[in-house]
């Protein structure tokens, strides 16, 4: 079995695969202070709760945008699973031609998403990942990673608004009854929800114009389903896109 880690700035998603089958997944808070032993104990608990044996994990794959966690996760892999993890980064085969000016600048999560989306849906593609940042990645029909856009994520944008405007409360991200809010909470919900829907629609429309083709638009990330319900520019929400990409890259680099 393969254990995969998608370490984001806010959350870490962990999945366990038996060949191509995702047996289970877990979402935990990303904590840069967590030690390798704490990760190991946590994983033992999660696996045993699902009747999975720690000894059945033969490989570990890690994608992380938090550099300070890498050493602890590598140590955890060696100590608890007796294996050297595959860390997504420069030198790891992805099957994509990276057309960035400096390919090393492309985040591991963006590469992983592109690999999975191209494998599952073909190209051309626009991949939108709703994470701490909202990222837009373009993949050509030939499997070239052409680049993309990075915008502030929904949660951090909302937190910035609340922290800088003393009278504004924290609100739940949900569809308001009306775009024209009748109180502070509904007005904030309207602005946040439809502000981000408009951002997604605007960027995707402009990208389609620039690449002069009609790509499929695949969305992933914690809030993908929420935004996708409010717009018709997203063709499909794929909750496990990143985890699937980690498994695919492992297969490319195995042996």
Swiss-Prot record:
Keywords on record: ATP-binding, Coenzyme A biosynthesis, Cytoplasm, Kinase, Metal-binding, Nucleotide-binding, Potassium, Transferase
Active-site positions on this chain: 109
Cofactor(s) needed for function: NH4(+); K(+)
InterPro entries: ATPase_NBD, Type_III_PanK
Pathway: Cofactor biosynthesis; coenzyme A biosynthesis; CoA from (R)-pantothenate: step 1/5
Residues that hold substrate according to the record: 100, 107-110, 184
Cofactor, free-text remark: A monovalent cation. Ammonium or potassium.
Catalytic activity: (R)-pantothenate + ATP = (R)-4'-phosphopantothenate + ADP + H(+)
Domain of life: Bacteria
Cellular component GO terms, alphabetical: cytoplasm
Signal peptide interval: none
GO BP: any one term: coenzyme A biosynthetic process
GO molecular function, one term: pantothenate kinase activity
EC number, as in UniProt: 2.7.1.33
Residues binding ATP: 6-13, 132
Positions contributing to K(+) binding: 129
Compartments, record wording: Cytoplasm
Assembly: Homodimer.
Family: Belongs to the type III pantothenate kinase family.
PANTHER family in UniProt: TYPE III PANTOTHENATE KINASE (PTHR34265:SF1)
Record protein name field: Type III pantothenate kinase
Record gene name: coaX
């Amino acid at each position: 079995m393969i254990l995969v880690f998608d370490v984001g700035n806010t959350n870490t998603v962990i999945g366990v695969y038996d060949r191509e089958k995702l047996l289970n997944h877990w979402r935990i808070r990303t904590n840069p202070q967590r030690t390798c032993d704490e990760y190991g104990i946590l994983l033992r608990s999660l696996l045993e709760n699902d009747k999975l044996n720690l000894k059945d994990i033969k490989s570990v794959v890690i994608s992380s945008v938090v550099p300070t966690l890498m050493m602890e996760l590598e140590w955890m892999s060696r100590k608890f699973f007796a294996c050297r993890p595959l860390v997504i980064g420069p030198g790891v085969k992805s099957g994509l031609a990276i057309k960035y000016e400096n390919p090393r600048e492309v985040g591991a999560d963006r590469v992983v998403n592109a690999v999975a989306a191209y494998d599952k849906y073909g190209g051309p593609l626009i991949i939108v990942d709703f994470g701490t940042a909202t990222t837009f990645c373009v993949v050509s029909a030939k499997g070239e990673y052409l680049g993309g856009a990075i915008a502030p994520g929904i949660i951090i944008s909302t937190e910035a608004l609340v922290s800088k405007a003393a009278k504004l409360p924290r609100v739940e991200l949900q569809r308001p009854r009306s775009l024209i809010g009748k109180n502070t909470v509904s007005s904030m919900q309207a602005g946040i929800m439809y502000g981000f829907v408009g951002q997604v629609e605007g960027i995707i429309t402009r990208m389609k114009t620039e690449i002069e083709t009609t790509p499929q638009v695949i969305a992933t990330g914690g809030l993908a389903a929420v935004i996708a319900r409010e717009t018709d520019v997203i063709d499909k929400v794929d909750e496990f896109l990143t985890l699937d990409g980690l498994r695919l890259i492992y297969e490319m680099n195995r042996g």
